[in-house]
Amino acid sequence: MSTIIMDLCSYTRLGLTGYLLSRGVKKREINDIETVDDLAIACDSQRPSVVFINEDCFIHDASNSQHIKHIINQHPNTLFIVFMAIANVHFDEYLLVRKNLLISSKSIKPESLDDILGDILKKETTITSFLNMPTLSLSRTESSMLRMWMAGQGTIQISDQMNIKAKTVSSHKGNIKRKIKTHNKQVIYHVVRLTDNVTNGIFVNMR
């Protein structure tokens, strides 16, 4: 299983390499990459099954973010796992935001990686056909409300602007927290901004 790791943190690289080796991936199939340009070349030449990327490698540069977005779109049969660079927050979940793009906490447990990568570790096949989890999506109301929430508007302001009861606003907030698997506002905002950065944003159900 060809794998690429793009993370400037040596501890993370060591941890991921150790995990992959313990699951039967050969050392020669694990490649460390440092730049987005090198990642594009490696993805074209190696057609990796999985690419691990730390968002710190691209998030601070708009052109790098666009390039990452392009690479993800160009390789639909590669699973890209992007680690959130968010400190001092207890969050060890992961979210599928596109068929081949998963946003994850760096605190993800080995068992969770097993759940995600289990089938691809056993079979030489495209990972995206095995991912048995729903893609994160919001209703139109949830999406509009989340933008207002992120803009610093409170429940009463959102209630007035959307012409819905405050209780309904709270209910929508509860749904958003459930879907993003956290009650931490900082994590929610981070997930939204990162998704906006490397895709066209969280899917919105137009129904």
UniProtKB/Swiss-Prot annotation:
InterPro entries, per database record? RcsA, Sig_transdc_resp-reg_C-effctor, Tscrpt_reg_LuxR_C, WH-like_DNA-bd_sf
| Cross-referenced Gene3D superfamilies | Winged helix-like DNA-binding domain superfamily/Winged helix DNA-binding domain (1.10.10.10)
User: Is Cell membrane tagged as a keyword?
Assistant: no
Superkingdom in the source lineage:
Bacteria
Q: Does the keyword Zinc-finger apply?
A: no
Q: Which GO terms describe its biological process?
A: regulation of DNA-templated transcription
Q: Residue ranges of the DNA-binding region?
A: 155-174
Limits of the HTH luxR-type domain: 131-196
Keywords noted in UniProt:
DNA-binding, Sensory transduction, Transcription, Transcription regulation
Q: Which SMART domains match?
A: HTH_LUXR
Pfam families named in the record: GerE
Q: Which Gene Ontology molecular function entries are recorded, alphabetically?
A: DNA binding
Assembly and binders: Interacts with RcsB.
User: What function does the entry list?
Assistant: Component of the Rcs signaling system, which controls transcription of numerous genes. Binds, with RcsB, to the RcsAB box to regulate expression of genes. Involved in regulation of K30 capsular polysaccharide synthesis.
* Family, similarity comment: Belongs to the RcsA family.
Q: What is this protein called?
A: Transcriptional regulatory protein RcsA
Q: Which organism is it from?
A: Escherichia coli
